Regions:
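Extended, histidine- and acidic-residue-enriched regions that form the cofactor-binding/catalytic faces
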Residues: 1-87, 91-109, 115-230
């Protein structure tokens, strides 16, 4: 193990670890968000936590506990799915990072396990640079896994509870996956056109509107694809 999980060390050890050369890792993955009838509500949390553990095993970083709640507006209509408004979410994450900035830390990695969270976190990255001189790198899970997923996945479209996500969960937490409940369904994305200041503006609804809360074909998922994607 090259890195350190902050939750596993004592306060004196923490004091030794935290300095101007420290790289802090903050994983963010929804711990209570619908993922269809076949995947657990904590799917994003499990995947992000796994990626954080792998990063910590390989790199000299100090990793914080995975943050389970974030900005997920597409799921406000689904019972049990926790959503934090964008401004509150950005302030919350800023407070977390500033807890280390005040002790000289200037380098951070956010492992972003979401899609809707990416823009708020990119904005926060600029804020942290402008206010504190801190560098915050925000990963893009879809970007990191996209090339591998394109090579191994067969679904015609996807994005949530789909072939890719189901395959990954089968690779890391197979006991939580109910493949007998897997479905193929695709989200409709209605576009509302408006004219503002002489320009056409398109507003695309991102709400999850499929019957089971899946966008893609989860029935095509095996563990082996998940291992390749990871």
């Amino acid at each position: 193990m090259k890195g350190t999980f902050i939750k596993e060390i004592t306060y004196p050890e923490c004091c030794e670890q935290i300095n101007e050369n420290t790289v802090i890792v903050l994983p963010i993955g929804g711990g209570s968000k619908e993922h269809g009838s076949h995947l657990p509500m904590g799917t994003d949390y499990y995947v992000t936590d796994y990626l954080a553990a792998e990063l910590t095993r390989r790199c000299e970083v100090v990793t914080l506990p995975t943050l389970p709640f974030a900005y997920f507006p597409a799921f406000v209509g689904w019972k049990g799915s926790v959503h934090i408004e964008a401004e509150n979410f950005m302030h919350y994450v800023e407070d977390i990072l500033y807890s280390f900035v005040r002790f000289g830390v200037k380098k951070f990695i956010i492992i972003d396990g979401g899609i809707s969270t990416h823009i708020p976190l990119q904005i926060l990255s600029h804020t942290m640079r402008n206010k504190y001189g801190a560098t915050v790198a925000v990963t893009n899970y879809n970007g990191l896994s996209g090339e591998a997923a394109d090579q191994v996945c067969q679904q015609k479209a996807g994005g949530h509870g789909d072939e890719e996500e189901t395959s990954v969960l089968l690779a890391i937490r197979p006991e939580l996956v109910k493949m007998e409940c897997a479905v193929e369904e695709y989200r409709e994305m209605p576009v509302e056109n408006q004219i503002q200041n002489g320009r056409a503006v398109a507003h695309i609804s991102m709400a999850m509107n499929t019957p089971h809360g899946v966008n893609g074909n989860s029935k095509l998922a095996p563990r082996e694809k998940g291992e390749l994607i990871l």
